[in-house]
């Protein structure tokens, strides 16, 4: 890797079982060897995984890593967010990922915060500059946005509210990211915009995720993945090459680093990162 020290970070989701929590620590140890900047931990809505998120944050912090817990608007009150912020600060947590979050089925209200912008603003009001705040960016447009320009304007509002850096939704079209960054810079946004990268491990699962979040899998990739059928080894080898090429183009194009959506697996992300270093 000839570029200057790109950043590296990983996302985990909180395991639902004690066995999963133990496995996550093993995954963490394997990825920690790559010297990432931090690990983010997702946050379940409505209490579904909130306790597990707190447990994962505690365990990963105790293992010596910088951890960035997710905060979401869904069901949150000013008091509940204030309690989380104070608790994380007491643990020495210095970074957060502030998101609107997805409404669970049947939920009609987000709570006291309607948008991630409101959440970012509240964190700054309550905690000053203690936390580095990451927010989401959508190179292929948020699925609920009315237009690319409206989506970019909303992103700029989050930055103006106090965000320090952004992580994108995953994508497989480098041009989408490069165009988004160019448009953001033209709009006066100067914070780092780090591409979020999802390894390709399972076509059915990836298709479901992508349909839900609005991420586009280019047609040529879909056709190749579908043609592998149950040949998972060949599918993953192809997926590895696709993502390595994507990351290489992104870093060459000026991306400040890579944020991996790990699905709590170390091997695929580590292999991609090592390939980029050759």
Please provide the spans of the model-predicted regions.
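Conserved N-terminal beta1-alpha1 strand-loop-helix module at the mouth
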Residues: 1-41
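Short, well-ordered coil/turn segments that N-cap beta-strands
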Residues: 3-7, 35-38, 63-67, 92-94, ...
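Active-site mouth loops of central-metabolism enzymes
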Residues: 7-23, 45, 67-79, 132-150, ...
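Conserved, mostly hydrophobic/aromatic
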Residues: 11, 39, 88, 158, ...
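Short, acidic/polar
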Residues: 18-31, 53, 78-86, 146-157, ...
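Active-site pocket-lining/capping segments in soluble small-molecule metabolic enzymes
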Residues: 19, 111, 115-138, 188-240, ...
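Active-site-adjacent beta->alpha loops and helix N-cap segments on the catalytic face
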Residues: 19-21, 47-59, 77-84, 102-126, ...
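Catalytic beta/alpha-barrel core
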Residues: 39-49, 71-73, 97-99, 164-173, ...
């Amino acid at each position: 890797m000839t570029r200057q020290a790109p950043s590296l970070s990983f996302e985990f989701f909180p395991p639902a079982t004690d066995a999963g929590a133990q496995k996550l620590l093993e995954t963490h140890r394997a990825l920690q060897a790559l010297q990432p900047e931090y690990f983010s931990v997702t946050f379940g809505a409505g209490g579904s995984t909130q306790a597990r998120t707190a447990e994962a944050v505690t365990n990963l912090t105790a293992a010596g890593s910088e951890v960035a817990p997710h905060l979401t608007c869904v069901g949150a009150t000013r008091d509940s967010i204030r309690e989380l912020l104070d608790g994380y600060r007491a643990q020495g947590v210095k970074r957060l990922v502030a998101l609107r979050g997805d409404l669970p089925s049947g939920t009609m209200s987000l709570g006291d915060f309607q948008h991630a912008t409101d959440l970012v603003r509240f964190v700054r009001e309550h905690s000053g500059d203690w936390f580095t705040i990451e927010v989401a960016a959508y190179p292929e447009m948020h699925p609920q946005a009315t237009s690319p320009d409206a989506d970019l304007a909303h992103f700029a509002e989050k930055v103006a509210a106090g965000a320090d850096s952004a992580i994108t939704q995953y994508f497989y079209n480098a041009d989408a990211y490069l165009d988004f960054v160019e448009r953001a810079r033209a709009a006066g946004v100067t914070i780092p915009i780090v591409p979020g990268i999802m390894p390709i491990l399972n076509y059915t699962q990836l298709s479901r995720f992508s349909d839900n979040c609005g991420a586009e899998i280019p047609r040529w990739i879909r056709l190749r993945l579908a043609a592998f059928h149950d040949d998972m080894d060949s599918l993953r080898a192809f997926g590895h090459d696709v993502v390595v090429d994507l990351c290489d183009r992104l870093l060459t194009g000026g991306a400040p680093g890579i944020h991996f959506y790990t699905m709590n697996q170390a091997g695929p992300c580590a292999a991609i990162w090592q390939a980029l270093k050759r």
